[in-house]
Amino acid sequence: MGEIKAKINYGKLKELIQNMSKSYSVKVGVLAGHGAEETTESGINYAELGAIQEFGCDIKITQKMAAYLAITAKELGLPKLQAKGDGYVHIPSRSFLRMPLTTKNRVVKELKKQLDADEDAIIAYIAKNADFMTLAVMLGVSAKEVVLRAFETDGFGQWKANSPYTIARKGSAKPLQDTGSLWQKIAYEVNQDGK
C-alpha cells in the first residue's frame, strides 16, 4: 500500500521526535506476520481484501457469477437482477488506512492529546532512559485506534453505503462489518532500523 508520513511540530518534543525517527519507524495496517497472509472465506488473503477495500475495484461478471448473483437475489427475495449496467461489480473505495490517518492528522492530534497532560514527565522519562521505543509504541497504538475507529463509524461517515443487495445478503447496512475479520487483522509494529 502507500506510506503516510506525519510531521509533528510539538514544542519540546520536536527534537526528541526527530531523533526517534532516525532510528524507529511505525507501521499500521494489515501487516505480514500479523494475519495478512491468512486466507478469507472468499479465497483471497487479508492483504488482498484490505487493498480491495482501501482502493476499491471493479470485478468483471462472468456467466457463473451472474448465475450465482441471480440465485442469491431470488433466495433473498430481491427483485430479479436486470442485465443492465456495464458487466462489472463495482466495489467502492472504503479507505480504512489512508483517510483516517491523513484526514486532519488524527493520529498526530490523538498522540498530542495523550501527551499533553504529561509532557514534562514523558520528556524526562525518555531523556533519562533513552527509550524512544516507548514513544514509537505510543504512536503505533494511537494509529491503530484511529484505524479501528474508522470501522466503528463507517469511515467517520465518509464510506459509501452498502447496496440493497449487499444489505440483504449480509443482513447489515454497515460497510466492512459482516464478519469483523478484516478489522481484527489491523496491527502495528515498531521497527528499530527507522525503515
Tell where the protein language model's regions lie, with residue ranges.
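Short, Lys/Arg-rich flexible segments
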Residues: M1-K195
